[in-house]
Amino acid sequence: MDGALLIDKPKGITSTEVVERVKEKLKARKAGHTGTLDPIATGLLIILINKATRFSQFFIGMPKTYRFTVKFGAETDTYDAQGKVVETYEGELNCDKLKEVLNEFRGEILQTPPPFSAKKIKGRRAYELARKGKKVELKPVKITVYSLELLSCNPREKEAEFLAEISSGGYVRSLAYDIGKKLGIGGYMKELRRLKIDEISVEEAVSLEEFLSSENPEEYVLPVDTLFRVIPEVRLNTFEAGKILQGKRILIKNYDYEGLVKIYEDSKFIGIGELKGGVLSPKRLLV
Protein backbone atom coordinates (compact mmCIF):
# COMPACT_ATOMS: atom_id res chain seq x y z
CA MET A 1 0.00 0.00 0.00
CA ASP A 2 1.56 3.25 -1.20
CA GLY A 3 -0.13 6.62 -0.88
CA ALA A 4 -0.75 9.76 1.15
CA LEU A 5 -2.73 10.48 4.28
CA LEU A 6 -4.13 13.90 5.22
CA ILE A 7 -4.20 14.31 9.00
CA ASP A 8 -5.59 17.24 11.00
CA LYS A 9 -2.90 17.35 13.70
CA PRO A 10 -4.08 18.14 17.24
CA LYS A 11 -2.23 20.45 19.61
CA GLY A 12 0.29 19.03 22.07
CA ILE A 13 1.87 16.34 19.91
CA THR A 14 4.91 16.43 17.63
CA SER A 15 4.69 15.73 13.91
CA THR A 16 7.07 12.79 14.39
CA GLU A 17 4.73 11.25 16.98
CA VAL A 18 1.84 11.53 14.52
CA VAL A 19 3.90 9.76 11.86
CA GLU A 20 4.83 6.94 14.24
CA ARG A 21 1.22 6.36 15.27
CA VAL A 22 0.07 6.35 11.64
CA LYS A 23 2.87 3.98 10.65
CA GLU A 24 1.95 1.57 13.44
CA LYS A 25 -1.77 1.70 12.64
CA LEU A 26 -1.22 0.97 8.94
CA LYS A 27 1.63 -1.49 9.63
CA ALA A 28 3.58 0.45 7.01
CA ARG A 29 7.23 -0.18 6.18
CA LYS A 30 7.97 3.52 5.76
CA ALA A 31 6.19 6.76 6.57
CA GLY A 32 7.16 10.41 6.72
CA HIS A 33 5.60 13.87 6.86
CA THR A 34 6.20 16.59 4.28
CA GLY A 35 6.77 19.54 6.61
CA THR A 36 6.73 19.71 10.39
CA LEU A 37 4.19 21.41 12.62
CA ASP A 38 5.34 22.41 16.10
CA PRO A 39 3.54 20.79 19.08
CA ILE A 40 1.70 24.07 19.72
CA ALA A 41 0.28 24.03 16.18
CA THR A 42 -2.72 22.26 14.67
CA GLY A 43 -3.82 21.60 11.13
CA LEU A 44 -2.87 19.90 7.91
CA LEU A 45 -0.10 17.31 7.98
CA ILE A 46 0.58 15.26 4.85
CA ILE A 47 1.97 11.82 5.64
CA LEU A 48 3.43 9.75 2.82
CA ILE A 49 3.28 5.96 3.06
CA ASN A 50 5.86 3.44 1.74
CA LYS A 51 6.94 4.19 -1.86
CA ALA A 52 5.07 7.50 -1.82
CA THR A 53 7.79 8.84 0.52
CA ARG A 54 9.92 9.23 -2.63
CA PHE A 55 7.85 12.30 -3.51
CA SER A 56 8.35 14.23 -0.26
CA GLN A 57 10.61 16.85 -1.87
CA PHE A 58 7.79 18.08 -4.10
CA PHE A 59 5.47 18.71 -1.15
CA ILE A 60 8.13 20.35 1.02
CA GLY A 61 8.58 23.06 -1.59
CA MET A 62 4.87 23.93 -1.77
CA PRO A 63 3.51 27.20 -0.27
CA LYS A 64 1.56 26.90 2.98
CA THR A 65 -1.43 28.86 4.30
CA TYR A 66 -1.75 29.57 8.02
CA ARG A 67 -4.14 31.25 10.44
CA PHE A 68 -2.28 32.47 13.51
CA THR A 69 -2.62 34.66 16.58
CA VAL A 70 0.09 36.99 17.86
CA LYS A 71 0.25 38.12 21.48
CA PHE A 72 1.90 41.54 21.70
CA GLY A 73 3.68 43.13 24.66
CA ALA A 74 6.30 40.45 25.24
CA GLU A 75 8.93 38.30 23.54
CA THR A 76 9.85 34.69 24.29
CA ASP A 77 13.01 32.72 23.60
CA THR A 78 11.15 30.35 21.25
CA TYR A 79 9.08 33.11 19.58
CA ASP A 80 5.89 31.28 20.66
CA ALA A 81 3.70 30.76 23.72
CA GLN A 82 5.65 27.69 24.84
CA GLY A 83 8.83 29.65 25.46
CA LYS A 84 10.18 31.65 28.39
CA VAL A 85 9.39 35.37 28.42
CA VAL A 86 12.66 37.25 27.88
CA GLU A 87 11.36 40.80 27.34
CA THR A 88 8.20 42.75 28.18
CA TYR A 89 6.92 46.04 26.74
CA GLU A 90 4.54 48.70 28.06
CA GLY A 91 3.35 50.12 24.72
CA GLU A 92 -0.23 49.80 23.47
CA LEU A 93 -1.34 47.88 20.37
CA ASN A 94 -2.42 50.36 17.70
CA CYS A 95 -4.48 48.56 15.04
CA ASP A 96 -4.02 51.28 12.39
CA LYS A 97 -0.26 51.18 12.85
CA LEU A 98 -0.36 47.38 12.68
CA LYS A 99 -2.12 47.53 9.31
CA GLU A 100 0.60 49.86 7.99
CA VAL A 101 3.41 47.68 9.31
CA LEU A 102 2.05 44.59 7.55
CA ASN A 103 2.88 46.16 4.17
CA GLU A 104 6.57 45.64 4.98
CA PHE A 105 6.05 41.89 5.38
CA ARG A 106 4.36 41.15 2.07
CA GLY A 107 6.19 39.89 -1.00
CA GLU A 108 9.84 38.85 -1.02
CA ILE A 109 11.48 39.48 2.36
CA LEU A 110 14.54 38.46 4.36
CA GLN A 111 13.64 36.46 7.45
CA THR A 112 15.88 35.14 10.23
CA PRO A 113 14.74 31.70 11.49
CA PRO A 114 14.00 31.33 15.23
CA PRO A 115 16.89 30.16 17.44
CA PHE A 116 14.71 27.19 18.42
CA SER A 117 14.46 25.74 14.91
CA ALA A 118 15.70 22.75 12.92
CA LYS A 119 18.15 24.88 10.94
CA LYS A 120 21.71 23.56 11.10
CA ILE A 121 24.78 25.39 12.37
CA LYS A 122 28.02 23.52 11.62
CA GLY A 123 26.13 20.23 11.46
CA ARG A 124 24.08 20.74 14.62
CA ARG A 125 20.42 21.71 14.93
CA ALA A 126 19.89 25.27 16.16
CA TYR A 127 17.43 24.13 18.85
CA GLU A 128 20.06 21.77 20.31
CA LEU A 129 22.40 24.71 20.87
CA ALA A 130 19.60 27.00 22.11
CA ARG A 131 18.48 24.43 24.70
CA LYS A 132 22.01 24.40 26.11
CA GLY A 133 21.92 28.16 26.48
CA LYS A 134 24.43 28.76 23.70
CA LYS A 135 24.14 31.80 21.47
CA VAL A 136 22.48 30.96 18.18
CA GLU A 137 23.25 33.13 15.16
CA LEU A 138 21.33 32.19 12.03
CA LYS A 139 21.62 33.95 8.71
CA PRO A 140 18.50 35.56 7.23
CA VAL A 141 16.98 33.70 4.29
CA LYS A 142 14.89 34.98 1.41
CA ILE A 143 11.24 33.91 1.58
CA THR A 144 8.02 35.05 -0.07
CA VAL A 145 4.90 36.09 1.80
CA TYR A 146 2.30 35.73 -0.95
CA SER A 147 -0.47 37.19 1.20
CA LEU A 148 -0.81 38.56 4.73
CA GLU A 149 -4.23 39.61 5.99
CA LEU A 150 -5.26 41.04 9.35
CA LEU A 151 -8.39 39.15 10.45
CA SER A 152 -8.93 40.81 13.82
CA CYS A 153 -7.20 43.21 16.21
CA ASN A 154 -7.89 43.47 19.94
CA PRO A 155 -5.97 46.33 21.63
CA ARG A 156 -7.41 45.46 25.03
CA GLU A 157 -6.01 41.92 24.95
CA LYS A 158 -2.99 43.01 22.89
CA GLU A 159 -3.74 40.26 20.37
CA ALA A 160 -4.30 40.07 16.62
CA GLU A 161 -5.24 37.25 14.28
CA PHE A 162 -3.78 36.86 10.79
CA LEU A 163 -4.12 34.79 7.63
CA ALA A 164 -0.95 34.26 5.60
CA GLU A 165 0.33 32.25 2.65
CA ILE A 166 4.07 31.72 2.90
CA SER A 167 6.70 30.06 0.73
CA SER A 168 8.70 27.03 1.76
CA GLY A 169 11.32 27.88 4.39
CA GLY A 170 9.27 30.59 6.07
CA TYR A 171 8.58 30.61 9.82
CA VAL A 172 5.34 32.03 11.22
CA ARG A 173 7.07 32.35 14.60
CA SER A 174 9.66 34.67 13.05
CA LEU A 175 6.92 36.62 11.29
CA ALA A 176 5.16 37.16 14.63
CA TYR A 177 8.42 38.18 16.31
CA ASP A 178 9.38 40.57 13.51
CA ILE A 179 5.96 42.25 13.40
CA GLY A 180 6.18 42.84 17.15
CA LYS A 181 9.68 44.27 16.79
CA LYS A 182 8.56 46.61 14.03
CA LEU A 183 5.69 47.87 16.19
CA GLY A 184 8.12 48.39 19.07
CA ILE A 185 6.01 46.39 21.52
CA GLY A 186 7.31 42.87 20.98
CA GLY A 187 5.25 39.85 20.09
CA TYR A 188 5.13 36.07 19.98
CA MET A 189 3.01 33.46 18.24
CA LYS A 190 0.20 32.35 20.54
CA GLU A 191 -1.67 29.97 18.22
CA LEU A 192 -1.11 28.48 14.76
CA ARG A 193 -3.25 26.42 12.41
CA ARG A 194 -2.12 25.22 8.98
CA LEU A 195 -5.07 25.50 6.62
CA LYS A 196 -3.56 24.56 3.27
CA ILE A 197 -0.51 23.11 1.56
CA ASP A 198 -0.65 24.36 -2.01
CA GLU A 199 -4.23 23.52 -3.09
CA ILE A 200 -4.72 20.79 -0.44
CA SER A 201 -7.06 21.90 2.36
CA VAL A 202 -7.27 20.82 5.99
CA GLU A 203 -11.01 20.37 5.36
CA GLU A 204 -10.08 17.23 3.41
CA ALA A 205 -8.15 15.81 6.36
CA VAL A 206 -9.23 13.32 8.99
CA SER A 207 -8.60 13.93 12.68
CA LEU A 208 -5.86 11.82 14.22
CA GLU A 209 -8.33 10.44 16.77
CA GLU A 210 -10.80 9.35 14.08
CA PHE A 211 -8.06 7.73 12.01
CA LEU A 212 -6.57 5.80 14.93
CA SER A 213 -9.98 4.52 16.03
CA SER A 214 -10.98 3.38 12.53
CA GLU A 215 -11.41 -0.34 11.85
CA ASN A 216 -10.48 0.28 8.21
CA PRO A 217 -7.73 2.95 8.27
CA GLU A 218 -6.63 2.11 4.72
CA GLU A 219 -9.73 3.86 3.38
CA TYR A 220 -8.14 7.21 4.28
CA VAL A 221 -5.00 6.59 2.21
CA LEU A 222 -5.12 8.51 -1.09
CA PRO A 223 -3.20 7.90 -4.33
CA VAL A 224 -0.26 10.30 -4.09
CA ASP A 225 -0.76 11.69 -7.61
CA THR A 226 -4.18 13.10 -6.62
CA LEU A 227 -2.39 15.63 -4.40
CA PHE A 228 -0.34 17.15 -7.25
CA ARG A 229 -3.22 19.34 -8.33
CA VAL A 230 -1.50 22.11 -10.26
CA ILE A 231 0.97 19.86 -12.10
CA PRO A 232 -0.13 18.86 -15.63
CA GLU A 233 0.02 15.25 -16.76
CA VAL A 234 1.67 13.38 -19.62
CA ARG A 235 0.30 10.02 -20.76
CA LEU A 236 2.70 7.54 -22.34
CA ASN A 237 2.32 4.27 -24.17
CA THR A 238 3.95 1.09 -22.87
CA PHE A 239 7.13 1.56 -24.93
CA GLU A 240 7.63 5.18 -23.83
CA ALA A 241 6.87 4.35 -20.20
CA GLY A 242 9.40 1.52 -20.32
CA LYS A 243 12.13 3.99 -21.30
CA ILE A 244 11.20 6.34 -18.46
CA LEU A 245 11.18 3.46 -15.96
CA GLN A 246 14.73 2.65 -17.08
CA GLY A 247 15.71 6.21 -16.14
CA LYS A 248 16.03 7.35 -19.75
CA ARG A 249 14.83 10.58 -21.32
CA ILE A 250 12.37 10.56 -24.21
CA LEU A 251 11.15 13.04 -26.80
CA ILE A 252 7.58 14.26 -26.36
CA LYS A 253 5.67 15.89 -29.21
CA ASN A 254 2.88 18.48 -29.07
CA TYR A 255 3.68 19.78 -25.56
CA ASP A 256 4.59 23.46 -25.26
CA TYR A 257 4.63 23.30 -21.45
CA GLU A 258 7.94 23.24 -19.57
CA GLY A 259 8.25 22.17 -15.93
CA LEU A 260 7.21 19.33 -13.65
CA VAL A 261 4.62 16.85 -14.94
CA LYS A 262 2.80 13.78 -13.65
CA ILE A 263 3.67 10.75 -15.78
CA TYR A 264 1.14 8.04 -16.55
CA GLU A 265 1.37 4.77 -18.47
CA ASP A 266 -2.13 4.89 -19.92
CA SER A 267 -4.08 5.54 -16.67
CA LYS A 268 -1.44 4.25 -14.22
CA PHE A 269 0.64 6.85 -12.36
CA ILE A 270 4.34 6.02 -12.53
CA GLY A 271 6.05 9.16 -11.29
CA ILE A 272 7.04 12.80 -11.61
CA GLY A 273 9.16 14.06 -14.47
CA GLU A 274 10.40 17.31 -15.95
CA LEU A 275 9.53 18.46 -19.44
CA LYS A 276 11.96 20.84 -21.10
CA GLY A 277 12.48 21.56 -24.77
CA GLY A 278 10.27 18.65 -25.76
CA VAL A 279 12.36 16.21 -23.69
CA LEU A 280 10.83 14.34 -20.74
CA SER A 281 13.21 13.34 -17.92
CA PRO A 282 12.20 11.20 -14.92
CA LYS A 283 12.63 12.84 -11.50
CA ARG A 284 10.97 10.44 -9.04
CA LEU A 285 9.29 7.14 -9.91
CA LEU A 286 6.70 5.18 -7.95
CA VAL A 287 7.62 1.80 -9.42
UniProtKB/Swiss-Prot annotation:
Coiled-coil regions, chain positions: none
**Which Enzyme Commission number(s) are listed?**
5.4.99.25
- Tree of life domain: Bacteria
What biological-process GO terms show up in the record? mRNA pseudouridine synthesis; tRNA modification; tRNA pseudouridine synthesis
Leading EC class: isomerase
Quote one Gene Ontology molecular function term: pseudouridine synthase activity
Please provide the record's keywords in A-Z order: Isomerase, tRNA processing
Q: Does the keyword Isomerase apply?
A: yes
This enzyme catalyses: uridine(55) in tRNA = pseudouridine(55) in tRNA
InterPro entries, per database record: PsdUridine_synth_cat_dom_sf (IPR020103), PsdUridine_synth_N (IPR002501), PUA-like_sf (IPR015947), PUA_sf (IPR036974), tRNA_psdUridine_synth_TruB (IPR014780), tRNA_sdUridine_synth_fam1_C (IPR015240), TruB_C (IPR032819)
Q: Which residues form the active site?
A: D38
Q: Which HAMAP family match?
A: TruB_bact (MF_01080)
- What exactly does this protein do? Responsible for synthesis of pseudouridine from uracil-55 in the psi GC loop of transfer RNAs.
Family of the protein in this entry: Belongs to the pseudouridine synthase TruB family. Type 1 subfamily.
Q: Show the PANTHER family listed in the entry.
A: PSEUDOURIDYLATE SYNTHASE TRUB1, TRNA-PSEUDOURIDINE SYNTHASE
What is the name of the protein in this document?
tRNA pseudouridine synthase B
Annotated organism of origin? Aquifex aeolicus (strain VF5)
Kindly list the organism's lineage.
Answer: Bacteria, Pseudomonadati, Aquificota, Aquificia, Aquificales
